[in-house]
Amino acid sequence: MRELTLTTTVFQTTKSQEIFAAAQKLMPGGVSSPVRAFKSVGGQPIVFDHVKGAHIWDVDGNQYIDYVGSWGPAIVGHAHPEVIDALHAALEKGTSFGAPCLLENILAEMVIAAVPSVEMVRFVNSGTEACMAVLRLMRAYTQREKVIKFEGCYHGHADMFLVKAGSGVATLGLPDSPGVPKATTAATLTAPYNDLEAVSRLFEQYPNDIAGVILEPVVGNAGFIPPDAGFLEGLRELTKQYGALLVFDEVMTGFRIAYGGAQEKFGVTPDLTTLGKVIGGGLPVGAYGGRAEIMKMVAPAGPVYQAGTLSGNPLAMTAGIKTLEILSRPGSYEHLDRITGKLVQGLLDAAREFGHEVCGGHISGMFGLFFTAGPVTNYEQAKQSDLKKFAAFHRGMLEQGIYLAPSQFEAGFTSLAHTEADIERTIAAARTVLSQL
């Protein structure tokens, strides 16, 4: 096995720059997903070579403590030996069947047992795909067209969701995307996150037209923004009152902030749920599920069509099964909560010591830090952050061997592989950087 050691102590990125320069001639912006291009933090992106545990190495030999975790999936740590061994065994049987396999049943049973709202589940290949499918399903079930989403919440890059969206859309400062027909988004209503009165007004305006409300129960694609007390409960009451569906997009929070996701954490059960990231153990995956009476409308059981060549492929199912097995062991979420709490408090204390206005928080292994006094309870408040200061902080941390998400508008993640030493090293690095900003 490759020896995972620090190969250089001098931060230099010559090879990364060469590879990225070549990539820009081959792919739009040189990347396969916009946020990776470092547009909001400046400089050129780092090109990675290999990963292990809580650490990553780039092509120049620089080593980093990782708080991106492949944008969330690496919750048990990168290249976990049990996951790798399971994948090796699965590879011997083939990479894709395009037909039913037992592994789908096993992962489905695990998801249904864990997530309160899910009685039946359909596997797809990405979170975007899951949200596209669930939108079609909620409209078919209610026979209504309008849907409420929240400013700064991100539900993938499907046309109907690219209205005041988060994630890369927020990072690039785009109000929406060219190429999206107005008719496609005409039925998409928006409200500020954590504003129950705004949602109530929309229902009063369209009492018989709204199919449902979809949201990230904890926002992670406009930075880390938790729900105010009573917000999720209020949405549940409003949707029931008006005969609409409540959909939790738990692509990010599912199995991340609790084994049963945000709905377990907050005790609010939606009608439908979308999942991704963690349930694929680092391989491409998505899923949507909910009440059986609704899910039975999905083809071939019902008339709502959705399909996928690689859906339920054995490699993603294998990685997901093993990842959930590891997560279900005693102490997993206690570890995530402890180390993430220590990390966030250390970052906040360091920033304030050196005179920077910051706010932030965490839930289990999901966290965020804004360069504004706060509080931040919605996307508009998140946009008050000092983006230039964040960019300088990000670059400084990178040079100190700490890899943070290259955008103020993305949540951070810890893993079971992060140690107390990793956290202490990160806080020490932050003190060095913050003292110089």
Curated annotation (Swiss-Prot):
InterPro entries reported for this sequence: 4pyrrol_synth_GluAld_NH2Trfase (IPR004639), Aminotrans_3 (IPR005814), Aminotrans_3_PPA_site (IPR049704), PyrdxlP-dep_Trfase (IPR015424), PyrdxlP-dep_Trfase_major (IPR015421), PyrdxlP-dep_Trfase_small (IPR015422)
Named cofactor requirement(s): pyridoxal 5'-phosphate
UniProt keywords, alphabetically: Chlorophyll biosynthesis, Cytoplasm, Isomerase, Porphyrin biosynthesis, Pyridoxal phosphate
GO biological process, one term: chlorophyll biosynthetic process
GO CC terms in record: cytoplasm
Pathway: Porphyrin-containing compound metabolism; protoporphyrin-IX biosynthesis; 5-aminolevulinate from L-glutamyl-tRNA(Glu): step 2/2; Porphyrin-containing compound metabolism; chlorophyll biosynthesis
CDD domains linked: OAT_like (cd00610)
Subcellular locations according to the entry: Cytoplasm
Cross-referenced Gene3D superfamilies: Aspartate Aminotransferase, domain 1, Type I PLP-dependent aspartate aminotransferase-like (Major domain)
GO molecular function, one term: glutamate-1-semialdehyde 2,1-aminomutase activity
Catalytic reaction equation(s): (S)-4-amino-5-oxopentanoate = 5-aminolevulinate
Subunit record text: Homodimer.
Family per similarity comment: Belongs to the class-III pyridoxal-phosphate-dependent aminotransferase family. HemL subfamily.
Entries under PANTHER family matching the protein: GLUTAMATE-1-SEMIALDEHYDE 2,1-AMINOMUTASE, GLUTAMATE-1-SEMIALDEHYDE 2,1-AMINOMUTASE 1, CHLOROPLASTIC-RELATED
Name under which the protein is recorded: Glutamate-1-semialdehyde 2,1-aminomutase
Source species of the chain: Thermosynechococcus vestitus (strain NIES-2133 / IAM M-273 / BP-1)
Gene: hemL
